[in-house]
Each structure stands twice: as structure tokens, then as C-alpha cells.
Regions:
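Acyl-donor (CoA/ACP) binding surface of acyl/acetyltransferases
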Residues: 1-41, 58, 71-174
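Active-site rim helix/loop that mediates acceptor-substrate recognition in acyltransferases
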Residues: 46-67
Length: 174
């Protein structure tokens, strides 16, 4: 059962459901965030403990409340399998509003990140009315860079983000 933490709009694509996180997502989310191959491109680059993963889910719920947008849990529509997180993010201290995406290894290489990020980008433009949209990506994260470039983003500026060399990719205004 997926009881949403709060009322979060749902987005659907051909293969994905983007929905609010619920309590039943925690185990798979904690598993994903404990994987060093996932975490090496995020925040300080280290895997999250279960407690940290729980706090992150709580932050996502708070982001929806305080900002009116946030990250969605991503599941494969046919199987219902949890795949990761995708959405709009701009917590205090971030340099810009961004489209963020993190998928579990079992979802890599299938085009899910691009499909979900495209839906989030459309939501940011059409529903939120955003014109300045970015993705902040570590220089070493080639897969995420490919996703942002495939959606029309261009490298804008180099920054240090959570201690790692990163680039802000800006999506074109439409």
C-alpha cells in the first residue's frame, strides 16, 4: 500500500508513475541510498544510513509543504516496482531551482531517468510556471549529464557543490 505522506500530484508517462512517497517506499529507498554506486554522485558522496534515508524522506515531504513542489517516488507502471526519485527541488542553500533525478541500479540503462525528468521538466514549466530551470550535476556523473543534455540543457557554470566539482546545466526557456 502506498499511503501518500500528503497530497502530492501524480504524473504518469508511458512507463512511469511519479507519486508522493509513502511509508511503504522506505525499505527500497533506504536500500537505494545505501548503495555506494548511487550515493557517490549525491551530496557528500557517501551512502546514507537508514536513519539518514528516513530523514531525507521527511525532508521531501516538508519540501512539498514549504515550496509547493518536490521529489516524487518513481515506480514502473506495469509492475509497481520502486525505481527511485525524480522531481523539482530547491532547498535552502541550493544555488538554483533544479530538476533532480536519482534511480536505483535496477532501473539504470532503461531510459527511465530521461522519461521521468522530461515529465518533471514539463510540470515545472506548465504547472509551476518556472522559466529558470537547472540540474546541478557532478562533473563525474556522465549518465546524469547525458540525461540533462538530451532534454536540451546546456552547461552554464562550474560550481563546487557539497565539496565536489559540479556544473549547473540550464534548460532552455520555452
Amino acid at each position: 500500500m502506498h499511503l501518500p505522506i500528503l497530497q502530492v500530484p501524480q504524473l504518469t508517462t508511458d512507463r512511469l508513475l511519479l507519486r508522493g512517497f509513502g511509508p511503504d517506499d522506505f525499505e527500497r529507498y533506504a536500500e537505494m541510498m545505501a548503495d555506494p554506486d548511487v550515493s557517490r554522485h549525491l551530496m557528500d558522496g557517501r551512502p546514507l544510513t537508514r536513519v539518514e534515508a528516513w530523514r531525507q524522506l521527511a525532508m521531501f515531504a516538508g519540501h512539498w509543504v514549504l515550496r509547493g513542489y518536490g521529489l516524487w517516488a518513481v515506480e514502473e507502471r506495469v509492475s509497481g516496482e520502486f525505481l527511485g526519485r525524480i522531481g523539482c527541488l530547491n532547498p535552502e542553500g541550493f544555488p538554483a531551482f533544479e530538476i533532480a533525478y536519482t534511480l536505483a541500479p535496477w532501473a539504470w540503462g532503461k531510459g527511465y531517468a530521461r522519461e521521468g525528468a522530461a515529465a518533471a521538466l514539463q510540470y515545472a514549466r506548465e504547472t509551476l510556471g518556472r522559466t529558470e530551470i537547472t540540474s546541478i550535476i557532478r562533473q563525474a556523473n556522465a549518465a546524469s549529464i547525458r540525461v540533462s543534455l538530451s532534454l536540451g540543457a546546456v552547461a552554464s557554470e562550474s560550481v563546487e557543490f557539497f565539496g565536489a566539482p559540479s556544473v549547473i546545466y540550464r534548460y532552455p526557456r520555452v
